[in-house]
Amino acid sequence: MENDLRAALIAWLAADPALAAINTIEEEAPLSATPPWLGIAASASVDWGTKDRPGREIRVALELESFTDQTAGDAPLLGTIERRVLDLPPFQTGFELASIRFLRSRSEARADNRRAALLEYRFRLFAPL
């Protein structure tokens, strides 16, 4: 289910016209892409479910790298990403979404006027019936 979630999440984010300012949205950090780019930095899953439905709890960290020398320069884009992730439709190929929860974020300045932001979410998924 973890790989199904990763694929669905990337496709969902890439399909949003409000995120058209992002040069590439990839499953992993792109090897050579001009910022801004968005990728899955990491994911991990554990067993989760209910009495009658098996599932997984999956944590996904998304990384946005952008060019800006302002601390809040990428804030509007991060807000759009957050809203889009939380709006992921519940019925997907390979799983049914039970819940999404924002866990934490980190932001840092990097060399050459680059900024990086990490957004971490918890997804609880049911296996398909």
Question: What are the language-model segments listed below?
Answer:
Residues 1-11, 44-57, 93-129:
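Short, charged interaction patches at domain edges and termini
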Residues 1-52, 83, 88-92:
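Small/polar-rich, solvent-exposed N-terminal microdomains that initiate assembly or binding
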Residues 40, 62-64, 121-123:
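Preference for bulky hydrophobic residues occupying beta-strand positions
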Residues 56-66:
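Active-site-adjacent structural patch at catalytic or cofactor/ligand-binding sites
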Residues 65-90:
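Mid-chain, well-packed structural core segment of small domains
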